[in-house]
Amino acid sequence: MKIRPLHDRVIVKRKEAESKSAGGIVLTGSAAGKSTRGTVTAVGNGRILDNGSIKPLDVKVGETVIFNEGYGAKIEKIDNEELLILTESDILAIVEE
């Protein structure tokens, strides 16, 4: 199944959380928490402005992003993969490696 986000929505596949603490302790289960990083798998056409024009999104497919866990993230299971549906404003940064 293919999913296509609308407007300023972005589909993100969450990356695995770090399994070691800063001190080198191996974390398991809920102690590891959920990552707030992911890879963009699809983007909408853009945000509709007040004048009716469309502003393209700044994020692109394939980019790694850091997102805000608590703001508007919707979790869906598509083909046994957990995907997040976020608005572009839920994304805090693009990771450049």
From Swiss-Prot:
Keywords recorded for this protein, A-Z: Chaperone, Cytoplasm
Disulphide-bonded residues: none
GO cellular component, one term: cytoplasm
Main location: cytoplasm
Origin superkingdom: Bacteria
Molecular function via GO: ATP binding; metal ion binding; protein folding chaperone; protein-folding chaperone binding; unfolded protein binding
CDD domains cross-referenced by the UniProt entry: cpn10
SMART domains per record: Cpn10
InterPro entries according to UniProt: Chaperonin_GroES, Chaperonin_GroES_sf, Chaprnonin_Cpn10_CS, GroES-like_sf
Keyword Cytoplasm belongs to the record: yes
Compartment(s): Cytoplasm
One GO term (biological process): chaperone cofactor-dependent protein refolding
Subunit structure comment from the entry: Heptamer of 7 subunits arranged in a ring. Interacts with the chaperonin GroEL.
Family statement: Belongs to the GroES chaperonin family.
Role description: Together with the chaperonin GroEL, plays an essential role in assisting protein folding. The GroEL-GroES system forms a nano-cage that allows encapsulation of the non-native substrate proteins and provides a physical environment optimized to promote and accelerate protein folding. GroES binds to the apical surface of the GroEL ring, thereby capping the opening of the GroEL channel.
Protein name as catalogued: Co-chaperonin GroES
Gene name, Swiss-Prot/TrEMBL: groES
